[in-house]
């Protein structure tokens, strides 16, 4: 199989796994989302739907190009958090992300700090974009959570609240590059914070996700201060060429890396975290067995038990390890296996050559 066809097939698989729609037959209808209507955007700024509605935006529409740029940037950071901005517009109850660019920030394993040079870069980039005819404004920021899921920490909530106060519409996107490599599908979340004095209704979490034990407290304290948006993806008729150019970098990194080897520290941390959660679940089980059942305990019983959550986490670790092992087996078959026909041709003696000379 040709390398180009292998890369194209891998890109198509990536698009299918992440529910990125195929190009439509009518390019004009497909590219309509890219048309920027300044009057419509100015009208939204005048009406300010976010002033009276605690969640005016319920959907995030992200272009395939912006998604891949954010994933490549997040993967390049490894275990260090990275940060960037997103450009786009708003359409009804949706924030449309059309492009993204990285910021030169100082990152650690748990946070990112934007310095003065990052703000200068941000202003200069936006100015040059306008000069080039790209009229889209900044509509949000993205950053990575390497290995600990897509949610907003206390610092993230404060940052997002500040941005929503002065720069609406604004969206927060979180990508987990470590879990993306392990699972194959992009681990991503899009969020907006509620107004400061707003108390949201008590609703169950729509989708379960694994949170490390040392992050659960931070997650639990702030999880009612923001809400998640439904994410969909789109691409234009001209995106294919740009995606091909960007995919070459992503594809080479995918081929040359192994989730089993590259994520060893992450997997070891997950197993240690699982052991701590098992110990905690055992302690809670002992208390519930010998203690009095209070009303708060009965309410907790209606929720998923800690042991059931541990079972989910262990199943997820197992599935990711099997996925990594399968990818290694497939790569071994593709690049290291020798065909039987080649073996036979190399081991068989060459009968077509000249006969050896024998003295009479």
Curated annotation (Swiss-Prot):
Gene3D superfamilies: Cytidine Deaminase, domain 2
PANTHER family xrefs: EUKARYOTIC TRANSLATION INITIATION FACTOR 3 -RELATED
Assembly and binders: Component of the CSN complex, probably composed of CSN1, CSN2, CSN3, CSN4, CSN5, CSN6, CSN7 and CSN8. Interacts with MCM2.
Chain intervals with Polar residues compositional bias: 341-350
Domain MPN, chain residue ranges per copy: 60-197
Keyword Hydrolase attached: yes
Highest rank taxon of the organism: Eukaryota
One annotated GO biological process: response to iron ion starvation
Coiled-coil segments on the chain, per record: none
Gene name as annotated: CSN5
Record's note on what induces expression: Down-regulated during the early stage of iron deficiency (at protein level).
Keywords on record: Developmental protein, Hydrolase, Metal-binding, Metalloprotease, Protease, Signalosome, Zinc
Name listed for the protein in its UniProt record: COP9 signalosome complex subunit 5
An MF annotation (GO) of this entry: metal ion binding
Role this protein plays: Probable protease subunit of the COP9 signalosome complex (CSN), a complex involved in various cellular and developmental processes such as photomorphogenesis and response to hormones. The CSN complex is an essential regulator of the ubiquitin (Ubl) conjugation pathway by mediating the deneddylation of the cullin subunits of SCF-type E3 ligase complexes, leading to decrease the Ubl ligase activity of SCF. Involved in early response to iron deficiency.
Any one GO CC term of the record: COP9 signalosome
Motif (JAMM motif): 143-156
């Amino acid at each position: 199989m040709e390398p180009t066809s292998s890369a194209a097939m891998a890109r198509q698989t990536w698009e299918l796994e992440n529910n990125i729609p195929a190009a439509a037959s009518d390019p004009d209808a497909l590219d309509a989302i890219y048309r920027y209507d300044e009057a419509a955007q100015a009208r939204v700024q005048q009406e300010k739907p976010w002033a009276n509605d605690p969640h005016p935006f319920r959907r995030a529409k992200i272009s395939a190009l912006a998604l891949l740029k954010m994933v490549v940037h997040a993967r390049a950071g490894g275990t260090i958090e990275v940060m960037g901005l997103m450009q786009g517009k708003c359409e009804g109850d949706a924030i449309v992300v059309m492009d993204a660019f990285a910021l030169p920030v100082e990152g650690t394993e748990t946070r990112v700090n934007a310095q003065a040079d990052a703000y200068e870069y941000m202003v200069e980039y936006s100015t040059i974009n306008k000069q080039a005819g790209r009229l889209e404004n900044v509509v949000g920021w993205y950053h990575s959570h390497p290995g600990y899921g897509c949610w907003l920490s206390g610092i993230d909530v404060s940052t997002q609240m500040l941005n929503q106060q002065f720069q609406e519409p604004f969206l927060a996107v979180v990508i987990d590059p470590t879990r993306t490599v392990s699972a194959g599908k992009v681990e991503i979340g899009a969020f907006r914070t509620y107004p400061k004095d707003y108390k949201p209704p008590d609703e169950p979490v729509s989708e379960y996700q694994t949170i490390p034990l040392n992050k659960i407290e931070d997650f639990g304290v702030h999880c009612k201060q923001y809400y998640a948006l439904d994410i969909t993806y789109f691409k234009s008729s001209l995106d294919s060429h740009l995606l091909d150019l960007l995919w070459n970098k992503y594809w080479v990194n995918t081929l040359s890396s192994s989730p089993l080897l590259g994520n060893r520290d992450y997997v070891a941390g997950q197993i240690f975290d699982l052991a701590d959660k098992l110990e905690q679940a055992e302690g809670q089980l002992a208390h519930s067995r010998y203690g009095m059942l209070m009303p708060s305990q009965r309410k907790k019983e209606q929720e998923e038990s800690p042991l059931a959550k541990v079972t989910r986490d262990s199943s997820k670790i197992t599935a990711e390890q099997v996925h990594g092992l399968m990818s290694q087996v497939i790569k071994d078959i593709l690049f290291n296996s020798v065909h039987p026909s080649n073996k036979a041709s190399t081991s068989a003696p060459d009968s077509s050559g000249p006969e050896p000379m024998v003295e009479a």
